[in-house]
A protein has these predicted regions:
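Gly/Pro/Ser/Thr-rich low-complexity, intrinsically disordered segments predominantly at protein N-termini
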Residues: 1-156
Length: 156
């Protein structure tokens, strides 16, 4: 692990309740979807007073955190550790744990989660209610929905 850290190969690694999860860097197709998603989210997020970012540390400390592919943040967000976010997005890669992160995101009061699956060409928009996520057609935070996003994404 020290060698991974020194080489910078641990940028996407996460710690789940003290358990280290090694996550490889994204593929070209993943990176392409991520860049396009950031561009598509920028205007509706800005219009709603939210800031768009790429990967960030969601959690309180190095002992339990996740690194989503990106997110939307309210004014005042910043620093190394984000206790919450308005929205996080995950891009599904083979063998990843995007869906398993939902309970963690719920515990950290992330309002919405967007899970984009390039293989299936789908975008699942989820909203937090009563401690769990449910699929919704449109975001409650920004003027965008899963159908429109799916249509506009430049799929690999």
């Amino acid at each position: 692990m020290d060698r991974r850290r020194r080489a910078g190969a641990d940028r996407f690694d996460e710690v789940w309740e003290g358990v280290y999860h090694m996550v490889p860097g994204p593929s070209h197709a993943h990176g392409r979807i991520e860049a396009h998603l950031l561009a598509l989210l920028r205007k509706p997020a800005t219009d709603a007073g939210l800031e768009v970012t790429g990967q960030f540390n969601l959690g309180e400390s190095e002992h339990d955190f996740r690194v989503p592919d990106g997110g939307l943040h309210r004014a005042g967000a910043g620093g190394m550790w984000h206790p919450t976010a308005a929205l996080v997005f995950e891009i599904v890669s083979p063998g990843d744990e995007s869906w398993q992160k939902l309970p963690f995101y719920a515990r950290h009061d992330v309002d919405e989660v967007l899970i984009v699956d390039p293989t299936e060409r789908t975008a699942a928009w989820l909203a937090l209610g009563d401690g769990e996520y449910r699929r919704v057609e449109r975001s409650g935070l920004i003027e965008l929905g899963s159908a429109e996003l799916t249509e506009r994404l430049d799929w690999p």
